[in-house]
């Protein structure tokens, strides 16, 4: 099988590596001349995918290369690039392993929070109202991936210094700080046919956010079932077509969901493969055309992936 992977950053490294484990041939497309995933790909094409469909000779050459593969898998979170890819693939009849509707919700922390509230998902206490705000709190820009722009604020002065123009409900999420260990898990499939994968423990620090992943999890079976139920409920509400991950914290008061992302993650899929032999890239591809993923190992083994 031949796949096009668009984006050579962390997600691209993950996908190119897993593609090799699956025995796939990869075409990596990135606008940079030497992205991190470059040496993991079989073929590389430098291209700005927002220009697909244009008249440029080099762009048309890249289009021809992409059309020679079986499926396009995005490994980036640039809204303009994703929209351009979605439109171009639709026009060309090319399979695109992406759910734009689910991504539109999960790429916004405000829209995600609305979904959590509709689903009854346990989340950190909102802290937008000054009269009920208890520090420390977490400030998150609504748009953006992971921990980018997220700050732990200890008092009102720090909040005003970090958001000097005042709190804009359209641009920020303020919520109570929740201490405790962090966990992640993925779900993949189509409505009525989802599979939930191995829970992983996230190693966190102040400097690098997630600095490593451990599998299998050290959490209790009952806590794992609680995470799985929350993720399945969210996927069904979104009518997810593809792959989504969930990050939670186990607080003294119970589980608190931090975020969901309907895109291919980095770090955790490698840990899942090392522990179980299950390849999340294969399962993602199987959502879009007939493909039989490998069965994995009989029993999980210990894996610790640090970076």
Regions found by a protein language model. Give the residues of each.
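A short glycine-rich, hydrophobically flanked beta-strand micro-motif that places a catalytic Asp/Glu
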Residues: 240-252
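ATP-dependent carboxylate/phosphate-activation module, predominantly the ATP-grasp catalytic core
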Residues: 175-238, 250, 261-289, 296-298, ...
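Short glycine-rich anion-binding loops that position phosphate/pyrophosphate groups of nucleotides
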Residues: 77-79, 142-144, 263
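Conserved protein kinase catalytic/activation segment
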Residues: 254-256
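Short, charged, surface-exposed secondary-structure boundary motifs
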Residues: 36-40, 54-57, 104-111, 149, ...
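Active-site nucleotide/adenylate-binding loops and adjacent lid/helix of ATP-dependent enzymes
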Residues: 103-180, 190-193, 213-233
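ATP-binding N-terminal substructure of ATP-dependent carboxylate-amine bond-forming enzymes
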Residues: 1-98, 293
């Amino acid at each position: 099988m031949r796949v096009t992977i668009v984006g050579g950053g962390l997600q691209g490294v993950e996908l190119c590596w897993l593609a090799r484990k699956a025995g796939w041939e990869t075409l990596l497309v990135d606008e940079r001349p030497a992205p991190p995933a470059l040496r993991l790909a079989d073929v590389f094409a430098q291209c700005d995918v927002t220009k697909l469909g244009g008249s440029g000779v080099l762009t048309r050459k890249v289009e021809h290369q992409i059309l020679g593969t079986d499926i396009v898998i995005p490994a980036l979170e640039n809204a303009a690039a994703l929209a351009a890819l979605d439109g171009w693939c639709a026009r060309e009849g090319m399979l695109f392993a992406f759910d734009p509707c689910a991504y539109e919700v999960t790429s916004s922390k405000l829209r995600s929070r609305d979904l959590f509230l509709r689903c009854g998902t346990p989340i950190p206490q909102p802290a937008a109202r000054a009269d009920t705000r208890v520090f420390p709190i977490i400030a998150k820009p609504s748009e953006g991936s992971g921990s980018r722009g997220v700050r732990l604020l200890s008092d009102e002065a720090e909040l005003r210094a970090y958001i000097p123009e005042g709190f804009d409900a359209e641009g920020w999420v303020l919520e109570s700080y929740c201490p405790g260990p962090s966990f992640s898990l993925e779900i993949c499939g189509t409505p009525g046919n989802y599979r939930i994968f191995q829970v992983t423990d996230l190693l966190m620090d102040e400097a690098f956010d997630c600095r490593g992943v451990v599998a299998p999890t050290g959490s209790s079976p009952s806590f794992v079932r609680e995470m799985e139920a929350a993720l399945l409920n969210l996927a069904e509400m979104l009518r997810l077509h593809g792959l989504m991950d969930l990050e939670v914290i186990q607080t003294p008061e119970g589980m608190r969901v931090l975020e969901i992302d309907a895109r291919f993650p980095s770090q955790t899929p490698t840990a899942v493969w090392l522990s179980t032999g299950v390849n999340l890239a294969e399962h993602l591809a199987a959502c879009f055309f007939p493909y039989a993923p490998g069965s994995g190992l009989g029993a999980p083994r210990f894996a610790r992936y640090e970076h």
